[in-house]
Amino acid sequence: MTQDELKKAVGWAALQYVQPGTIVGVGTGSTAAHFIDALGTMKDQIEGAVSSSDASTEKLKSLGITVFDLNDVDSLGIYVDGADEINGHMQMIKGGGAALTREKIIASVAKKFICIADASKQVDILGKFPLPVEVIPMARSAVARQLVKLGGRPEYRQGVITDNGNVILDVHGMEILDPVAMENAINAIPGVVTVGLFANRGADVALIGTAEGVKTIVK
């Protein structure tokens, strides 16, 4: 199976967690896009979705799925999203698609976080994939200096402005042995909006696409 076929398999597998009559939290990226396609087949059974990016909102609406503002939703049963890396503790690096802040906000509200990913995203130690950090533009250089002190090599993601109007620093060369401590340390830097480490709030269920089929891991 190709990588895209594995992504499609886990996207469709996540449908089993969607309860009729509910509002579904939806992530961003190539794997989440497959889940949105699958969700389209249930559009008449669900109330709608809360979206983590303008791109996902557009796709949801094109399939006839109602998109709610998170401020108008009291609770979310599930949030379904991909990951750039996921470790054995269900902690993740996310944000390759620059939607990390909205993703983290929606994940924090959802009762259950379902991570959908192909097997190439599984790692023992997080950090080989560059760690995205969303930053207020005026703080870019100041934040970069602090990230160097934490052992990383930050690189400005040229030409990318997030849906919130901010910039992204991708931090290379990190070996993140304590993801919770690293998430807290980076979030504490003035000017950081959020870091793409999902350690304090990791996934509850991981659906991993493998050549043998979809593997389910429950926290």
Curated annotation (Swiss-Prot):
EC number(s) on file: 5.3.1.6
Pathway: Carbohydrate degradation; pentose phosphate pathway; D-ribose 5-phosphate from D-ribulose 5-phosphate (non-oxidative stage): step 1/1
Annotated keywords: Isomerase
Residues forming the catalytic site: E103 (proton acceptor)
Gene Ontology biological-process entries: D-ribose metabolic process; pentose-phosphate shunt, non-oxidative branch
Domain of life (superkingdom): Bacteria
Classification via InterPro entries: NagB/RpiA_transferase-like (IPR037171), Ribose5P_isomerase_typA_subgr (IPR020672), Ribose5P_isomerase_type_A (IPR004788)
Binding-site list for substrate: T28, G29, S30, T31, D81, G82, A83, D84, K94, G95, G96, G97, K121
Spans through the membrane: none
Reaction(s) catalysed by this chain's protein: aldehydo-D-ribose 5-phosphate = D-ribulose 5-phosphate
Pfam families given in the database record: Rib_5-P_isom_A
Recorded GO MF terms: ribose-5-phosphate isomerase activity
Keyword flag Ligase: no
GO terms under cellular component: cytosol
Family: Belongs to the ribose 5-phosphate isomerase family.
Subunit structure: Homodimer.
Entry-linked PANTHER family: RIBOSE-5-PHOSPHATE ISOMERASE
Functional description taken from the UniProt entry: Catalyzes the reversible conversion of ribose-5-phosphate to ribulose 5-phosphate.
Protein name in the entry: Ribose-5-phosphate isomerase A
UniProt source species: Escherichia fergusonii (strain ATCC 35469 / DSM 13698 / CCUG 18766 / IAM 14443 / JCM 21226 / LMG 7866 / NBRC 102419 / NCTC 12128 / CDC 0568-73)
